[in-house]
Regions:
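Soluble regions of membrane-associated proteins that transit the secretory/organelle pathway
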Residues: 3-6
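Long, hydrophobic alpha/beta structural blocks
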Residues: 14-17, 21-324
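C-terminal, beta-strand-rich globular interaction domains
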Residues: 277, 286-378
Length: 378
């Protein structure tokens, strides 16, 4: 799915734009026991409660592609005949109305999910979307539809204990101490099937993880029985390892600055283009950056081999997963230097009297803990 398709579905999660009739779910305690079930009609829920349910489910379609939103791809064999795909199709085709199917799905989540000692809420809903056609100007015609996109959305929300506070009890006309439990934003969730080319793709699902470095592979294994792509944090670490292992001493400050600047430029240009498809970087593209910086062909070949080992043959990466385009940071054991990414060139490395130094020009005013200071010898 691309950004436009995700955004199109996100807009469904408003009171006046969806065909959601019921919200299903269950509340699970830290001992993996179901405490209570949810089976609520959207038509009779107070509007503020209905909107809160919709907002929680909509979060499952938020974040960045390839970071928070990850494509789950089923094999042809799984789609043809597998328990995991059959269950997901049954959830969708029954519109979640079959309680036994819902229970089987809940148990898959409960038996696999690791949220520590947290209680949590599993939410499920089904929607049918009359997909409007687009005219010659790529504008949607709300009155024309050729297909209905039937899909389910699931999210898992931690339920957190609220600290004890004083509260007013109208029945007693008094204040008493009170506590409660609050449903937090979803930790994970998914959409099935995927909405590719504005149509159902039963070979894919879209998985959501709030944390980009912890995508809950245990749930992906249980529900989808497949291996998810590397998380953003894993991609970054693997890319850094491939560079440092292959380049050795050639992996210096100037080279890393150049790589950061080139990737940042690609990210900025992609944003300006408003291209809904995720930005991709091939290993050949990364190798070309090294070549432009004078890296020896032998080391470039070693880098390509390392990438093949880390990511697999023919892998494509998202530059936004490899660098933080909003800053340029240099760390030593005792200090951290952070500069605006457009000024990364200001940071230099020097060896003076046998010691390594980081140098930054100080042509403008200098502040230390908010105090303006001067340089000795000015």
């Amino acid at each position: 799915m691309n950004l436009k398709e995700v955004s199109e579905l996100r807009r469904r999660f408003r009171m006046d734009r969806n065909a959601i009739s019921r919200i299903y779910g269950c509340f699970v305690n830290s001992s993996r026991e179901i405490v209570s079930y949810i089976d609520e009609s959207m038509g009779i829920l107070p509007q503020d409660e209905a909107e809160k349910y919709l907002n929680l489910l909509k979060k499952t379609l938020s974040g960045k592609l390839w970071k928070n939103l990850i494509d789950i791809i089923f094999s042809t064999e799984q789609v043809a005949d597998s328990d995991e795909h059959r269950l997901l199709m049954a959830l969708r085709d029954s519109q979640l109305k079959d309680g036994d199917i819902r229970e089987e799905f809940y148990q898959k989540i409960i038996n696999s999910l690791d949220l520590g000692d947290s209680n949590y809420l599993i939410l499920l809903t089904h929607d049918s979307y009359d997909v409007p056609r687009k005219n010659k100007n790529d504008e949607m015609d709300a009155d024309a539809s050729d297909a209905v996109f039937s899909y389910v959305v699931c999210c898992v929300c931690p339920v957190k204990e609220r600290k004890v506070e004083l509260g007013f009890f109208p029945g007693d006309n008094e204040f008493h101490s009170c506590a409660g439990q609050i449903v937090a934003a979803p930790e994970l969730g998914f959409l099935f099937p995927a909405f590719d080319d504005r149509a159902a793709n039963i070979y894919n699902a879209l998985f959501y993880s709030r944390k980009t470095d912890e995508i809950h592979q245990e749930v992906i294994d249980s529900v989808f029985h497949t291996t998810a792509p590397m998380s953003a944090a894993e991609q970054k670490e693997a890319f850094q390892n491939a560079l440092s292992e292959a380049l050795g001493d050639a992996c210096n400050m100037e080279l890393v600055q150049s790589i950061h600047d080139r990737l940042r430029d690609q990210i900025e240009q992609h944003k300006e283009s408003h291209d809904p498809e995720p930005l991709e970087l091939s290993v050949s593209d990364a190798a070309a950056i090294l070549r432009d910086n004078g890296v020896e062909e032998e080391k470039i070949l070693a880098f390509r081999d390392s990438c093949a080992t880390q990511f697999g043959d023919g892998a494509t990466l998202n530059p936004a997963n490899l660098i933080d385009s909003s800053r340029f940071e240099v760390k030593t054991a005792d200090a951290t230097i952070s500069v605006g990414p457009e000024h990364s060139y200001l940071v230099e490395t020097r060896i003076i009297d046998g010691r390594k130094y980081l140098l930054i020009p100080a042509d403008e005013d200098i502040e230390v803990n908010g105090f303006g200071v001067r340089v000795k010898g000015e």
